[in-house]
Amino acid sequence: MNSLYSFIVKPLNKRYDNIRKIGDKKLILNTGIEDHQFISKKAIVVSTPAAFKTKVNVGDEVYIHHNVFRRWYDQKGKERNSSTYFKDDLYFVSPEQIYMYNLKPHLDYCFVKPLLNNHFLENRKEQPNVGVVKYTNNTLEALGITPGTLITFTPNSEFE
């Protein structure tokens, strides 16, 4: 089973990542489907696109956009799957929705580790708009930006 232009993926565990184990107990963090923070972003590739070659292979663990597995309520209050749902817990994913595979950035994505805020008078956990490159890509490496490089970025350009 192959899609022409999309990957087919399935959730690594479940489509929502809202349970944490603390000792021998399980803590449910969220019971609703609305909050994007509790949607799983980890998936396993089941099929690669037939139209082109890619570095991502079947069986690779990928990090994807949070709306792929998301469920939502329509105007009548009926729960619906995302538009990427295919069947039997399988989803279509465009190449741009895959951010990382096997801990390597996909396409031109990079990942930045935030710096902790040491200013005791500020109520922020992390320093705004500054970080250290954790995972880079070929384009950035050609510019001399490698893992460990301290960088700044514009406000509201980051994704958590």
Question: Which residue ranges define each predicted feature?
Answer:
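Acidic-enriched and Gly/Ser
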Residues: 1-160
